[in-house]
């Protein structure tokens, strides 16, 4: 914690702890012994002679690596080119990590998009080796197909896809290999054109999670449409859940500004709702994905505070039963 809170330094933070093997292309010679180690933060200070620090919040491990030449100059240029995207923050200690929250209330625009999805045949061709003997198990609510070892279903209204495949005698692989192989599967199947990032690994059942992003912010929701779950057995995928619909055309005339609580007021609201900072695992500013009442081809992306407690992500208004839309109306 002392290293994280040291002054005059810059920090890059990942959404979740990332195995070093997945970052190996950034190292000159990363030894295989370190492949399974994970980090959640990269820290470097203003002294050019000091190393770069790689940190794991959960285990409190700190790794050091040699600093690349002219690192600060490159980062200074990046900052100067995007000054308007930054806000002054204050550090807060939560259950799992130190979080940075804005000192003042912040304003972000609500987005409205037209959405599209590939045809069902696109996923059928990708997920089934042989389509000649498929059984059509469809209903009014779902498109559904199966063969002797796998089953696919797609919700007709939302486009949520679920897939299961039975695989026996899979090779036992280290965690970082499962994560890496799952990424290749997602890249092949998902036609999301905006960024998506690794968002966690469940060691108990080999589930790998990814989350979609827009404008640098993660997508959540009461139904978590931003989350992709993939389960690996060896190097093969056995389960998959994700949203086939993707944002396509922004309707800029429907956008509107939403003002969110400052960090201090956010924590005060949670505390008043019965949640102490030591119960809070993570806090993120993100978009709440909801389908428009006009049409399921229209999606509202509303900026909100999202909080992870007991392993579950929910919006602030879900945790405390109130509203967080306008900071001025929050009572703080």
Question: Where are the regions a protein language model picked out?
Answer:
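Preferential activation on post-signal-peptide N-terminal prodomains/segments
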Residues: 1-174
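Short, surface-exposed beta-strand-loop junctions and turns on beta-sheet-rich folds
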Residues: 61, 169-170, 246, 314, ...
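Helix N-terminus capping/helix-initiation residues
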Residues: 70-72, 118-119, 216, 262, ...
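Exposed beta-strand-loop-beta-strand "reactive/processing" segments of non-cytosolic proteins
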Residues: 122-152, 156, 161, 192-236, ...
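Short, non-transmembrane alpha-helical segments in secretory-pathway proteins
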Residues: 168-205, 216, 251-294
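Short helix-loop boundary/capping segments
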Residues: 235-259
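Hydrophobic, glycine-enriched assembly/anchoring segments
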Residues: 298-332
């Amino acid at each position: 914690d002392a290293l994280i809170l040291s002054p005059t330094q810059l920090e890059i933070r990942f959404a979740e702890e990332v195995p070093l093997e997945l970052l190996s292309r950034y190292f000159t010679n990363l030894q295989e012994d370190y492949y399974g180690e994970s980090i959640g933060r990269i820290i470097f200070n203003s002294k050019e002679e000091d190393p770069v620090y790689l940190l794991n919040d959960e285990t409190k491990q700190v790794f050091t690596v040699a600093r690349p030449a002219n690192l600060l100059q490159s980062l200074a240029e990046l900052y100067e080119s995007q000054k308007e995207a930054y806000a002054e923050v204050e550090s807060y200690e939560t259950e799992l990590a130190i979080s940075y929250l804005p000192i003042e209330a912040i304003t972000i625009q609500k987005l409205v998009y037209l959405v599209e999805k590939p045809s069902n045949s696109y996923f059928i061709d990708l997920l089934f080796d042989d389509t000649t003997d498929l059984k059509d198990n469809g209903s009014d609510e779902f498109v559904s197909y199966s063969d002797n070892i796998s089953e696919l279903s797609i919700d007709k209204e939302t486009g949520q896809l679920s897939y299961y495949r039975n695989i026996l005698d899979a090779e036992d692989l280290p965690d970082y290999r499962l994560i890496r192989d799952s990424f290749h599967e997602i890249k092949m199947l998902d036609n999301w054109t905006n960024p998506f990032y690794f968002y966690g690994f469940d060691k108990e059942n080999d589930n790998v999670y990814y989350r979609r992003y827009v404008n640098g912010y993660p997508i959540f929701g009461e139904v978590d449409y931003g989350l992709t779950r993939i389960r690996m057995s060896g190097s093969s995928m056995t389960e998959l859940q994700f949203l086939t619909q993707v944002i396509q055309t922004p309707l800029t005339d429907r956008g509107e500004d939403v003002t969110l609580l400052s960090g201090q007021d956010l924590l005060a609201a949670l505390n008043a709702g019965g949640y102490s900072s030591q119960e809070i695992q993570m806090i993120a500013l993100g978009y709440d994905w909801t389908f428009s009442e006009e049409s399921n081809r229209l999606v509202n992306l509303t900026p909100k505070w999202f909080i992870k407690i007991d392993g579950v992500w929910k919006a602030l208004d879900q945790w405390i039963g109130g509203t967080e839309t306008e900071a001025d109306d929050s009572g703080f």
